[in-house]
């Protein structure tokens, strides 16, 4: 092909590209199409074909130029419909889906790790409470035995000091418990509500509206239940106590802190962790 024909051929390609461009809205697919055409043997064959046409073309004939532009445009449209082009588009969509799934999986794993850590802290805290309960019961027994034997004032003073130390430790523990529940009780009970709604047998039964309940009131109710459970655990036999809030019952059971009365699902009691140690 001589230089004049080559220049003319490039002008036709440029003009045709201007015709195709407004019809192509998806730039990513156009890039894929161009990559496919450049690497495909079909393009070589098309160029050779058009070189022959251009070599016979006279620049003065505008009608012939327009005709060649339309024919080249149709050739490009046919190439876009090539079977080899479709798998590339499909692969691109699959790759995007895989990328989105990986991002979601990573996010879910991070959330799972946070929830596991919170549950671990709650179980550890419950174990500490049980240890304190056992220690308190033992000290009360020792105090009762000493009182019956009528120990001297020095022993009585030691008991008073031990009692004061116990009361101080108990106060510190309950202060920590209050702070923990103030910060985490609403979110923990909200998770328990989600579990209740998921397992609710009747789809038409209305679920409790968590947002309409004061977080402060809910936290205070949760604190009262914990205090009642701890006081109740000191009683021989540790009878079950009634808890009216379904969310609190659900959370205590899911966190393996309490067991439910087989006769009444609204009654619970603390699991004796000290017996398992």
From Swiss-Prot:
GO terms for biological process: cell division; kinetochore assembly; mitotic sister chromatid segregation. InterPro entries: Centromere_CenpK (IPR020993). It comes from the Eukaryota. The keyword Mitochondrion does not apply. It is found in: Nucleus; Chromosome, Centromere. Transmembrane segments: none annotated. One of its GO terms (cellular component) is cytosol. Belongs to the CENP-K/MCM22 family. Component of the inner kinetochore constitutive centromere-associated network (CCAN) (also known as central kinetochore Sim4 complex in fission yeast), which is composed of at least cnl2, cnp3, cnp20, fta1, fta2, fta3, fta4, fta6, fta7, mal2, mhf1, mhf2, mis6, mis15, mis17, sim4 and wip1. Interacts with mis6 and dad1. Component of the kinetochore, a multiprotein complex that assembles on centromeric DNA and attaches chromosomes to spindle microtubules, mediating chromosome segregation and sister chromatid segregation during meiosis and mitosis. Component of the inner kinetochore constitutive centromere-associated network (CCAN), which serves as a structural platform for outer kinetochore assembly. This is Inner kinetochore subunit sim4. It comes from Schizosaccharomyces pombe (strain 972 / ATCC 24843). The lineage of its organism: Eukaryota, Fungi, Dikarya, Ascomycota, Taphrinomycotina.
């Amino acid at each position: 092909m001589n230089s004049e024909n080559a220049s003319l051929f490039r002008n036709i390609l440029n003009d045709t590209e201007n015709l195709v461009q407004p019809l192509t809205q998806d730039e990513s697919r156009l890039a894929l199409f161009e990559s496919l055409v450049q690497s495909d043997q079909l393009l070589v064959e098309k160029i050779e074909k058009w070189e022959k046409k251009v070599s016979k073309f006279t620049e003065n004939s505008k009608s012939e130029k327009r005709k060649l532009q339309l024919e080249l445009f149709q050739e490009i449209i046919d190439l876009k419909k090539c079977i080899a082009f479709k798998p590339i588009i499909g692969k691109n969509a699959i790759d995007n889906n895989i990328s989105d799934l990986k991002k979601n999986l990573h996010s879910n794993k991070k959330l799972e790790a946070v929830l596991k850590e919170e549950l671990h802290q709650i179980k550890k805290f419950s174990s500490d409470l049980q240890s304190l309960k056992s220690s308190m019961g033992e000290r009360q027994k020792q105090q009762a035995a000493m009182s019956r034997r009528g120990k001297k004032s020095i022993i009585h003073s030691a008991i008073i000091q031990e009692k004061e130390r116990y009361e101080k430790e108990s106060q510190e523990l309950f202060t920590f418990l209050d702070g923990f529940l103030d910060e985490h009780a609403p979110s923990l009970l909200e998770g328990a509500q989600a579990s209740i709604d998921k397992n609710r047998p009747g789809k038409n039964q209305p679920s409790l509206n968590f947002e309409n309940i004061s977080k402060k009131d809910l936290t205070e109710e949760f604190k009262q239940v914990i205090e009642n459970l701890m006081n109740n655990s000191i009683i021989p036999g540790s009878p079950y106590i009634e808890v009216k809030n379904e969310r609190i019952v659900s959370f205590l059971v899911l966190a393996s802190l309490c067991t439910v009365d087989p006769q009444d699902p609204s009654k619970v009691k603390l699991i004796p962790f000290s017996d398992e140690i």
